[in-house]
Amino acid sequence: MKTVFAVLFLAFIALTYARSYEDVKEEIKNEVEKEILEDLEEESDDLNDKSKEINDAKPWRWVRKIRWRRLVPYLPAVIKAAGKK
């Protein structure tokens, strides 16, 4: 949503300072292309980071795969049972 407002704001600036309609169209087109390319770069960086994470050998990987939300409700009972010993 922020990018939409940024593009509209830049389009407004382009309209106020442009010499002709063609300049405005070219400016808007350039800004949209720039935003799309930046988004694609961010997504490719995210994909590269994920692939590195999967391919890295990490000894504590099993800890990350534990479903902590399912285990959290049982923690007080486990602590209570451990405290009775």
Curated annotation (Swiss-Prot):
The record's subcellular location field reads: Secreted; Target cell membrane
Q: Which domain of life is it from?
A: Eukaryota
Keywords on this record?
Amidation, Antibiotic, Antimicrobial, Immunity, Innate immunity, Membrane, Secreted, Signal, Target cell membrane, Target membrane
**Main subcellular location of this protein, as a coarse class:** secreted
Q: Report if keyword Membrane is assigned.
A: yes
Please list the tissues where expression of this protein has been recorded.
Expressed in entodermal epithelium along the body column.
Prosegment location in residue numbers: 19-57
Q: Which residues carry this modification: Alanine amide?
A: 82
GO cellular component annotations, sorted alphabetically?
A: extracellular region
Q: Signal peptide span per the entry?
A: 1-18
What is this protein for, i.e. what is its function?
Antimicrobial peptide with a broad-spectrum antimicrobial activity. Keeps its antibacterial activity under a wide range of salt concentrations that mimic physiological conditions of human blood, which is surprising, since Hydra is an obligate freshwater animal with nearly no salt tolerance. Does not affect red blood cells.
Concerning its family, UniProt says: Belongs to the arminin family.
Name of the featured protein: Arminin 2c
Organism lineage reads as: Eukaryota, Metazoa, Cnidaria, Hydrozoa, Hydroidolina
